[in-house]
Amino acid sequence: MEITIVKGDITEQEVDVIVNAANSGLLGGGGVDGAIHQAAGPDLLKECQEVINRIGSCPAGEAVITSAGDLKATYIIHAVGPIWKDGEHQEANKLASCYWKALDLAAGKDLTSIAFPNISTGVYGFPKKLAAEVALYTVRKWAEEEYDTSIKEIRFVCFDEENLKLYNKLINSEVV
């Protein structure tokens, strides 16, 4: 399994599934969520509304999968990251859960490639370095435990230079 880091637009990734940094209502919004909803087209919002009508809401740390509308990917996994408060409200555990559950959903559909944004580091205010550490640690731990998986590539798509530098530095460190 390969873990790669790129700078780019998550909506343009040619992978089986992209992960959306979603809100609990799955209704689109700003940042990554808004960009994905806009690029995927109106059918995505309809499908998300059907999911919410069925489950009520998607709390922080959880994830659901939908089709990808007009995107190059086949599926979108909507992972709801935590809003950063002070680090004393299970924020890191909820963030780790987003990555773990997204990988489980992708593997459950026998997908081979998944692209993640930097979940919760925008308007949700999660410290970027800590978020990168949690993300890299979690996907590595998942890969160790799920070594017999269909997933061959886990890609982190960094929108900004700061996250790109953090991920590139951390991927080669012993910290994660």
Curated annotation (Swiss-Prot):
InterPro entries per record: Macro_dom, Macro_dom-like
Protein's UniProt name: Macro domain-containing protein lmo2759
Pfam families: Macro (PF01661)
Originating organism: Listeria monocytogenes serovar 1/2a (strain ATCC BAA-679 / EGD-e)
Record domain Macro: where: 1-175
PANTHER family: GANGLIOSIDE INDUCED DIFFERENTIATION ASSOCIATED PROTEIN 2-RELATED, MACRO DOMAIN-CONTAINING PROTEIN
Matches recorded under CDD domains: Macro_OAADPr_deacetylase
Source species, domain of life: Bacteria
PROSITE patterns per record: MACRO
Recorded family membership: Belongs to the MacroD-type family.
